[in-house]
């Protein structure tokens, strides 16, 4: 695909000019909309791939420069444009939605399927730890209660507040 690049979808197809042209930039709002559309229409693995590429560019650029950029180079991942721009922030909500993780409260988690990303993901929120792997998800609540879900589908996981009281 001409647009599907190492760090996201390019704004336009690269021209023959070897310099930094606008076509080499990853437009974040557009990429996020495409990822949301992929997710909405059931293309979870493709959405996860696109989000992984975006996150890789964001983290590499942030580690190098200590700042978020307006956009990122689609082939190199280097930051482009304005520093500390809101446009360049990581799409955390979309990342979690693609992961199938909905945190209702620190004591109630809803899981939708398994981790589509190529690596294990650990999310920590107010004392609750969620370990998302390819074939199972483990939720460890702040009081130590642990639940592991190893079946596909949607699962509501809640902390039993009667234990330890």
Features from the language model and the residues they span:
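C-terminal capping/lid segments that line or modulate ligand- or cofactor-binding pockets
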Residues: 1, 21-130, 135-136
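Generic long, charged, amphipathic alpha-helical segments
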Residues: 3-27
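C-terminal beta-sandwich/jelly-roll accessory domains of carbohydrate-active enzymes
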Residues: 124-165
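Short, surface-exposed linear patches
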Residues: 2-6, 116, 153, 161-163
């Amino acid at each position: 695909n001409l647009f599907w690049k190492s760090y996201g979808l390019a704004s336009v197809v690269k021209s023959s000019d070897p310099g930094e042209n606008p076509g080499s930039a990853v437009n974040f709002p557009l990429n996020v909309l495409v990822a949301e559309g992929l997710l909405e229409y059931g293309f979870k693995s493709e959405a996860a791939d696109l989000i992984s590429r975006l996150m890789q560019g964001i983290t590499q650029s942030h580690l190098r420069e200590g700042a978020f950029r307006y956009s990122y180079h689609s082939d190199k991942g280097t930051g482009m444009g304005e520093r500390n721009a809101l446009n360049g922030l990581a799409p955390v909500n979309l990342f979690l939605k693609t992961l199938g993780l909905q945190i209702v409260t620190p004591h109630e988690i809803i899981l939708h399927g398994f981790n589509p990303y190529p690596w294990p993901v650990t999310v920590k929120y107010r004392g609750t730890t969620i370990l998302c792997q390819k074939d199972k998800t483990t939720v460890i609540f702040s009081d130590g209660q642990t639940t592991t879900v190893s079946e596909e589908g949607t699962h509501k996981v809640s902390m039993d507040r009667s234990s330890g009281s």
